[in-house]
Amino acid sequence: METPENRAAFQSASSLADACRDRQILEGRAVICDSSHNLVVDCGCMRGLIPREEGAIGMNDGSVRDIAVISRVNRPVCFLVTGFQKNEDGKTIALLSRRAAQELCMKEYVSTLVPGDIVNARITHLETFGAFADIGCGIVSLLPIDMISVSRIDHPRERFSVGMDITAVIKAIDNGRISLSHKELLGTWEENAALFSPGETVAGIIRSVESYGAFVELTPNLAGLAEIKEGISPGQQASVYIKSIIPSKMKVKLIIV
């Protein structure tokens, strides 16, 4: 919403009309979802209306539920301006389509993506098995929990929060469904290990406690093994002494202080 192009389009009715003519994808905040599940959007110089059937790809055939529209209230939504009309008070409002923006995004952007591409994404919601991220115009892809980082976590909220902007890698595309990965962007084992030296005492997070030791996260893509110490539990902050770093085995040995 804060791009110069977006701000310029919201300046006046004529600039919104230009955006309509040029089929420019804009983004505004949804402020109301009425009883018919139409979305009212703040377009700066005027209010805009996204009719329910224009709320998302799949609304018309029932493959997308109404909650996909209702949940957009107080959140940014992408859309195309499709026209203008007077409301019952005689005020001009912009007619908008999120569905059309999604179709344009699919055609000109998403359809060109291949595994290995790096994309910008925004976290939309979190589940125990992964994070869902908007890769453009409300087109959502899954980032599985084991693809978030090398260091294991119990829940994606340990890395992300809803509304957070991240970069991700296209991991796979299967029948139009896109899965993402994030851990490739956090550096290799060697790059992360180079940040530390034996003899240092550093901060870490206990990630798991096993019979043979405790795994302690030093960075999201680097963990070391420490002997179990009484009273430790997963998620706990800890100070650890780096006993050794063994590049040939990609191992870090630690002592919990």
Language model: regions and residue ranges:
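Single-stranded RNA-binding regions, centering on S1/OB-family and related RNA-binding modules
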Residues: 1-257
